[in-house]
From Swiss-Prot:
Disulfide bonds: none
Record key words, sorted: Aminopeptidase, Cytoplasm, Hydrolase, Manganese, Metal-binding, Protease
Subcellular location: Cytoplasm
Record InterPro entries: Leucine_aapep/pepB, Macro_dom-like, Peptidase_M17_C, Peptidase_M17_leu_NH2_pept, Peptidase_M17_N
Entry's Gene Ontology molecular function annotations: manganese ion binding; metalloaminopeptidase activity
Binding site for Mn(2+) 1: 274, 351, 353
Cofactor entry: Mn(2+)
Free-text cofactor note: Binds 2 manganese ions per subunit.
Entry protein name: Probable cytosol aminopeptidase
Amino acid sequence: MEFSVKNGSVEKQRTACLVVGVYEPRRLSAAAEQLDKLSEGYISTLLRRGDLEGKAGQTLLLHNVPNVPADRVLLVGCGKERELTERQYKQIIQKMVQAVSETGSMEVVCFLTELHVKGRTSYWNVRFAIEAIQESLYSYNDFKSIKPEVRREFRRVIFNVANRKDLADAERALEHGKAISTGVAFAKNVANCPPNVCNPAYLAELAKGLAAEYDNIRTTVIDEAEMAALGMNAYLAVSRGSQNPAYLSVIEYKNHPNPDAKPIVLVGKGLTFDSGGISIKPSDSMDEMKYDMGGAASVYGTMKALAEMKLPLNVIGVLAGCENMPDGNAYRPGDILTTMNGLTVEVLNTDAEGRLVLCDTLTYVERFEPELVIDMATLTGACMIALGAHNSGLMSTSNVLANELLNAAEQADDKAWRLPLGEEYQEQLKSNFADLANIGGRLGGAITAGQFLSNFTKKYSWAHLDIAGTAWKSGAAKGATGRPVSLLSQFLINKANNQ
């Protein structure tokens, strides 16, 4: 898909499809008003006749509009003018995509980016439009022998901005929007890939692929023998029951003006399949446990977006690849594991494996002397119960870092909600036989999981994103969401801007 921006007059657009907005009730946007004057009241006559009310998402396709050089004019309902939110704006853009896709038009000139969205600028309108278009056009058919038949997709979208002075911001939005939507698509592709293909070795090959593609990326892959030498016993215990060995992939992106600048480290839980191990999960929906590597997928997608944006930062992405399977050699409830930092952990449930993989990974990344560390993981069903499928759960030992992430989440419309940490939750992790238990009971399960991880992050500023509710969708819309690539990308953009 080719995207571009310009500042032009609506009446001069010679294109396959010209898109303008109509507010509720039957109120023309500025661009639609200009077309109405050019067509001598043709559009307003249709509205008075009741052909379009202007409710958000309604569409009306017009052909041969008098005096208008465009082949087609698509009117898109935008709801009430003063109540247009980011969510509604994206839905409007996606309705545009659906309508245009049915016409066979190859090019679209879109004036919806001139709409007033609450608290947003031309930059955000253009960037959100690109992300919404790519989201709408995304499909994953790699393993279908008969590909679904689709009409020719349009290949070019030209966004119009109302003021020439906004063109520079709009061009920047193009760059960021394309990079972030590419990163989201990469994350989705990896997460949607079946677990008999996407195993820890597959994740490692993807990480190597980034190094082959970008000169400022270097990838190191650590195998189980190296992990054993490092004392990553908790990580390895989870992997013991699987025929597929674990791999820890370290993707180093260096583009900071100061090559010695401390890196930002992103850690992703990469359980390419989680059966629960000996504490086996119910069979219902177990197929969705291929998504237990959503954290690693989002780190991979973010590193792709970062490389495309060429941000002047040093960033390290870590994919903690592993598989949790039942087997005669699998770890058991009652086992006591010695972690890489020396703390011992009593295993009370083998399905609380992500924190065991992450605790050793969080210790491992100390060697990079990071500016900060953010881990993301499909860690707990408890977070889904608490926050549903709309907000990722955020926990942090740093108020500054937490606020930066919450700000980025709001900016990117990739929402997160902060949950507490504290000594009272540490009490729930006490064990009679080890330093820690790997679960803290039913109450506050998402928080006690984050509290567990905090024991391994004492040497740097740290935040944890529990994406169990946001990394994928179930039911008829089953599939990966690519979250929180947008949030993380915005966080990195902000870091680059504030240096």
